[in-house]
Amino acid sequence: MQPIELSFEFFPPKTQEGVAKLRASRAELKTLSPKFVSVTFGAGGSTQQGTLDTVLEMATEGFEAAPHLSCIGSSKENLRAILSNYREHGIRHIVALRGDLPSGMGEVGELRYASELVAFIRQEHGDWFKIEVAAYPEFHPQSRSPRADLENFTRKVKAGANSAITQYFFNADSYFRFVEEAKKLGVDLPIVPGIMPITNFSQLMRFSDMCGAEVPKWIARRLESFGDNRESIRAFGVDVVTSLCRRLIDEGAPGLHFYTLNGAWASKTICERLGFKSALIAPMPSPRAARRAVFSLPL
């Protein structure tokens, strides 16, 4: 069995308090030996400098840091400058996304799709960058149909992607079905499931509505029944997501990519329940963690 790779997503903090929180969170998660960490990029490049600063700081701490890069609303000249800057700083990993057009921005930019961005990166920099792209097991909310979404995914792969990270989901069958359908179209790269820890009911429902992720009724009703009992929500959320991850690993998922929201507790608790031990706690892997992680988004 191949090692299971862990990776974690963060976003650029906007306050000094946020900076301190992120530093503490990634210090905790670093003990799980992630393969890489990714850093989001705001709509229309709104967090461009914050993304760069966060990525470079993480790189100095020994992380393989992968900045998100979205093409929507951006010119080729601007994208070329960003990529050159990352390359000059030794960054070799990119998460290539279409991104969302910010409210009030009329221009979509010179590249309209993530597949065009992937092709542009390859044209400009050859194999310098490892390129991640997004996959949608429950299909992208703006897609015409599941088939059209799958075909769009294959275009990103053929343009030169190395691997993919999915939108989060809570139905493992949707992930395995997507992987099988992608294989039928000739896709053979790793498709890593995106994992969203559950710690806040209203936040989860808001995010899921925005990105088109389905929250099963039984999960939503249980979470709703807890009301404002934060402790019960967190405990139930860890149980649900741990069970999901265990099935994904047991049935062949190549890794787990956690959407941390800049927190560490939930992601780390889930990983440890799965048998992935902190390097500071257990330098040698346990028998159960023999598949142990080199614990290493979206359209």
Go through each PLM region and give its residues:
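Short, well-ordered coil/turn segments that N-cap beta-strands
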Residues: Q2-E5, S33-F36, E61-A65, G90-R92, ...
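Conserved, mostly hydrophobic/aromatic
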Residues: E9, V37, Y86, K156, ...
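Catalytic beta/alpha-barrel core
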Residues: F36-T47, L69-C71, V95-L97, N162-N171, ...
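Short, acidic/polar
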Residues: Q16-L29, T51, K76-L83, S145-R155, ...
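Active-site mouth loops of central-metabolism enzymes
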Residues: E5-K21, A43, A65-E77, E132-A148, ...
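Active-site-adjacent beta->alpha loops and helix N-cap segments on the catalytic face
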Residues: G18-V19, G45-E57, S75-A81, L101-I121, ...
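Active-site pocket-lining/capping segments in soluble small-molecule metabolic enzymes
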Residues: E17, Y113-Y136, L185-V238, S243-L244, ...
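Catalytic domains of carbohydrate-active enzymes, especially glycoside hydrolases
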Residues: S25-T40, K158
